[in-house]
Amino acid sequence: MIINHNLPAMNAHRNMGINLNQGQKAMEKLSSGLRINRAGDDAAGLAISEKMRAQIRGLDQASRNSQDGISLIQTAEGALDEVHSILQRMRELAVQSSNETNVEQDQAALNDEFQQLVEEIERIKDTTQFNTQKLLDDTVDTVQLQVGANSGELIELDLTKVDLSAIHTALAAEDITDHTNAQSAIDAIDEQLKAVSEGRSYLGAMQNRLEHTIKNLDNASENLQAAESRIRDVDMAKEMMEFTRTNILNQASQAMLAQANQQPQAVLQLLR
């Protein structure tokens, strides 16, 4: 019988340390809700999870970018809607002035309103902005929308299709001071109505495209989050079982260590 080395106590102490360490890990996982809290828990899983997280955040931001694109389109489309209304009124004035029952004074009054509406189109062209960017003049030709999590995933919005510069220039050359000029103005306005309609149609198509883009991005983000969760999140029920197991083993180890420490006391019986 030896007393310098108590192997049963040493084994019990070693197992108690192992159980205590496993119990602490289980507590950390249960408190954080994560299976992987540091690289040592699962190095490969952590690398995959972080890559997925980067993609998820990129997809979510791309969705917000697309929403911003829709807001820009709605701003431009709202302005064009008002231009449409103005053109309709201008055409109405031109048709009225074309009627030769109007005297010169009547036509002059009609032309005054006509010219004011031309100036209003110019004002809309010059002041319609989104985040300080002018949308309806020739200041900006295209807007690149980042609609993906990775580089190069872009949608280009062509603002030249809604540029009002040419429309304003064409209308500024018209007047309805007499029958002949009013007839010419009707034809010119019809051309500009067509141009504005085409611009609004383009914006509507782009908005519909972005709405589908957002749905796809949100769906991809949701699926990727589910995949990332399977890698990184802890199974609470399973981990609770592990915590309970290690807790029981730890208590048992403590009890066995106490028993092992009592064994050398038997040596004292030999010395009596």
Curated annotation (Swiss-Prot):
<comment type="similarity">
    <text>Belongs to the bacterial flagellin family.</text>
</comment>
<dbReference type="InterPro" id="IPR001029">
    <property type="entry name" value="Flagellin_N"/>
</dbReference>
<keyword id="KW-0975">Bacterial flagellum</keyword>
<dbReference type="Pfam" id="PF00669">
    <property type="entry name" value="Flagellin_N"/>
</dbReference>
<dbReference type="InterPro" id="IPR046358">
    <property type="entry name" value="Flagellin_C"/>
</dbReference>
<comment type="function">
    <text>Flagellin is the subunit protein which polymerizes to form the filaments of bacterial flagella.</text>
</comment>
<dbReference type="InterPro" id="IPR001492">
    <property type="entry name" value="Flagellin"/>
</dbReference>
<keyword id="KW-0964">Secreted</keyword>
<dbReference type="GO" id="GO:0005576">
    <property type="term" value="C:extracellular region"/>
</dbReference>
<dbReference type="GO" id="GO:0005198">
    <property type="term" value="F:structural molecule activity"/>
</dbReference>
<protein>
    <recommendedName>
        <fullName>Flagellin</fullName>
    </recommendedName>
</protein>
<dbReference type="InterPro" id="IPR042187">
    <property type="entry name" value="Flagellin_C_sub2"/>
</dbReference>
<dbReference type="Pfam" id="PF00700">
    <property type="entry name" value="Flagellin_C"/>
</dbReference>
<dbReference type="GO" id="GO:0009288">
    <property type="term" value="C:bacterial-type flagellum"/>
</dbReference>
